[in-house]
């Protein structure tokens, strides 16, 4: 296997796509069997990563129209609905119910039954999508493409020369998103913008992670920070979704029917928000942007020097080998 510094743009892109397509195929049967919620989660992650990879490295790939991301988007939405319900149920059962008085637990039983019914229906829709000819045909076409990839000339250029460019598309918009600078969380519009920012952070993390073989310590630290921010905003969103779901299911208001649960949800939301604000204040600045851009440029330079030294070593090795052959050749 080639050293990362020797990879071309196409080497990296094809390797990522192949791994993610293989992951989708491997998770298909466990998701359909539905014996554990984890395969569904992992398949959804693989779908997202594949979509990000196809967009990120789109300039390298010659893909026919049938290989557009549309089937992936629809499949991801179906899996996402089931996954969201898994998360809601797990949060209620594992984290919240043990802290509630018996009266509130009893009042929640109809809500829990309704969530189970909705999750069963959502999983059925997800399975229906996974069995559709459009999705299975897309997978088959992508596997055929991987056997004989069609690439643009840019794919054959060294990855080390292009490392920052594969991040610039998201870097140009991520740090100027307005949701970084929200001081308080009051309006529904703000919640929607935070959810949109979370998606951008997730995309940034996946795109950085795609180039991880060539990344140094500072760039890898950025991946860890993005993951932490994504998880905090995800936690915040989950708590808000759960509150809305409970409001829809309960006969009265959440605050009056389930005061203990309502207090726990508000406490969790405030805790997430304070942690998020601390991180956001340290990251939403031109300095953080410049530091990450500088780290990527440094990674690019280091990878180029590594590639050049390896090429020089290989040339010297061949020259020495040829000289020895001449010395040992019978006269």
Write out the residue ranges for each language-model feature.
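Cationic, histidine-enriched alpha-helical/coil surfaces that engage anionic ligands
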Residues: 1-331
């Amino acid at each position: 296997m080639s050293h990362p510094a020797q990879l071309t743009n196409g080497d990296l892109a094809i390797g990522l796509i192949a791994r993610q397509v293989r992951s989708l195929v491997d998770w298909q049967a466990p998701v359909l069997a539905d014996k554990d919620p984890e395969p569904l989660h992992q398949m959804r992650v693989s779908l997202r990563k594949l979509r990000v990879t196809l967009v990120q490295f789109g300039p390298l790939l010659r893909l026919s129209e049938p290989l557009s991301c549309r089937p992936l988007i629809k499949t991801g939405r179906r899996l996402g609905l089931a996954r969201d319900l898994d998360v809601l149920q797990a949060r209620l059962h594992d984290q919240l119910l043990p802290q509630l008085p018996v009266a509130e637990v009893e009042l929640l039983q109809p809500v829990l039954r309704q969530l189970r019914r909705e999750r069963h229906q959502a999983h059925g829709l997800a399975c229906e999508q996974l069995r559709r000819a459009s999705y299975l045909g897309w997978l088959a076409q992508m596997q055929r493409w991987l056997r004989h990839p069609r690439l643009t000339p840019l794919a054959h250029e060294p990855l080390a020369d292009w490392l920052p460019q594969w991040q610039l598309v998201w870097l140009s918009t991520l740090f100027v998103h307005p949701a970084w600078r929200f001081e308080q969380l009051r309006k529904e519009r703000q919640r929607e913008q935070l959810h949109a920012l979370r998606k951008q952070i997730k995309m940034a993390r996946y795109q950085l992670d795609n180039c991880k073989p060539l990344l140094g310590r500072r760039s890898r630290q950025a991946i860890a920070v993005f993951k932490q921010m994504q998880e905090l905003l995800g936690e915040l969103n989950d708590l808000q979704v759960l509150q809305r779901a409970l409001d829809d299911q309960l006969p009265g208001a959440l605050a009056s029917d389930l005061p203990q649960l309502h207090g726990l949800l508000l406490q969790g939301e405030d805790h997430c928000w304070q942690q998020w604000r601390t991180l956001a204040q340290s990251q939403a600045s031109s300095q953080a942007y410049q530091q990450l851009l500088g780290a990527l440029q440094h990674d690019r330079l280091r990878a180029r020097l590594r590639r050049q030294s390896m090429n020089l070593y290989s040339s010297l090795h061949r020259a020495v080998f040829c000289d020895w052959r001449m010395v040992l050749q019978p006269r």
